[in-house]
Structure formats: structure tokens, C-alpha cells
């Protein structure tokens, strides 16, 4: 399903994302918009080596197990298919782990390209 922007803002605030790894909720909303278009079912194939799953586009090489990524680290200890359902609680735990280990949002290419260093106030405006 699509998670409406302001609902996502509420969910992220409730889960302590404001100020987490020094980033605002607006940064995360921008990341989600450009990674998955707010879709919980988002899927992206990166060729033979890995795939990205769910609203945060979590990668199968390092973070989740999809049964077809050779040498997957599965650092979030989760089946990738669980990252494409409507329950995003587990996605949130994994995304926080990724951000914590990176001390920021640099693992997400879309964040670096579209969000880093930009005015992101519009992502939370009116919520």
C-alpha cells in the first residue's frame, strides 16, 4: 500500500526518528519518497547481485535474506519478503540499524542524490 506522507511523518516521529543519527524526519520522508514512492511493496532488481525491498528499499546483499543473493549477510536477520508487507515495524527496525551503523543516511543513494543538503521543509509541511 501507499503510506500517505503525513501518516508516514507521524509513524516516524512515533518511532523516534526526529534527531536519530542527527537527521530530521524530513530527511527520512525525502528518502522514502525517492527510494520507494511511499510504497510498502516496492521492489527493485539490481541485476544478478542483489535486490532492494520495501518502503526503505533495503538491500538483500547486506540486510535481508531473499534466498537468491549469494553471500547475503542478512544483518537485520529478516526474510526480505517481510519488508514488502503492510507492517512496516520490522522495516523501521532494520532501517534504524542501517542508519546507526553508517552513522547517517549515506547508504541510501536516493538520499544522497535528492535530499542531502537540500531544504526539506516541504516534506513535513502541513503534517
From Swiss-Prot:
What is its cofactor?
A: Ca(2+)
The protein's enzyme class:
hydrolase
* Residues involved in Ca(2+) binding: 82, 85, 87, 90-91
Q: What is this protein called?
A: Lysozyme C
Tell me how the cofactor is bound.
Binds 1 Ca(2+) ion per subunit.
Alphabetized UniProt keyword annotations: Antimicrobial, Bacteriolytic enzyme, Calcium, Disulfide bond, Glycosidase, Hydrolase, Metal-binding, Secreted
InterPro entries per the UniProt record, alphabetical? Glyco_hydro_22, Glyco_hydro_22_CS, Glyco_hydro_22_lys, Lysozyme-like_dom_sf
Q: What does this protein do?
A: Lysozymes have primarily a bacteriolytic function; those in tissues and body fluids are associated with the monocyte-macrophage system and enhance the activity of immunoagents.
Q: What is its main location?
A: secreted
Supply the source organism for this entry. Columba livia (Rock dove)
Which reaction does this chain catalyze?
Hydrolysis of (1->4)-beta-linkages between N-acetylmuramic acid and N-acetyl-D-glucosamine residues in a peptidoglycan and between N-acetyl-D-glucosamine residues in chitodextrins
Checking SUPFAM superfamilies in the record gives:
Lysozyme-like
Where does it live in the cell?
Secreted
| Keyword Disulfide bond appears in the UniProt entry | yes
**Pfam families cross-referenced by the UniProt entry:** Lys
Molecular-function annotations in GO: lysozyme activity; metal ion binding
Q: Which residues form the active site?
A: 35, 52
One GO term describing the cellular component: extracellular region
Task: From the record, give the cysteines joined by S-S bonds.
Answer: 6-127, 30-115, 64-80, 76-94
The miscellaneous annotation reads: Lysozyme C is capable of both hydrolysis and transglycosylation; it also shows a slight esterase activity. It acts rapidly on both peptide-substituted and unsubstituted peptidoglycan, and slowly on chitin oligosaccharides.
Amino acid at each position: 500500500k501507499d503510506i500517505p506522507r503525513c501518516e508516514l511523518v507521524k509513524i516516524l516521529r512515533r518511532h523516534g526518528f526526529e534527531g536519530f543519527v542527527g537527521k530530521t524526519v524530513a530527511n527520512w520522508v525525502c528518502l522514502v519518497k525517492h527510494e520507494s514512492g511511499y510504497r510498502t511493496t516496492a521492489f527493485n532488481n539490481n541485476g544478478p547481485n542483489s535486490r532492494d525491498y520495501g518502503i526503505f528499499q533495503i538491500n538483500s546483499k547486506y540486510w535481508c535474506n531473499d534466498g537468491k543473493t549469494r553471500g547475503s549477510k542478512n544483518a537485520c536477520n529478516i526474510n526480505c519478503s517481510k519488508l514488502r508487507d503492510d507492517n512496516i515495524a520490522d522495516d523501521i527496525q532494520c532501517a534504524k540499524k542501517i542508519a546507526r551503523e553508517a552513522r547517517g543516511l549515506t547508504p541510501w543513494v536516493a538520499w544522497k542524490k535528492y535530499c542531502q543538503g537540500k531544504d526539506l521543509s516541504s516534506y513535513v509541511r502541513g503534517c
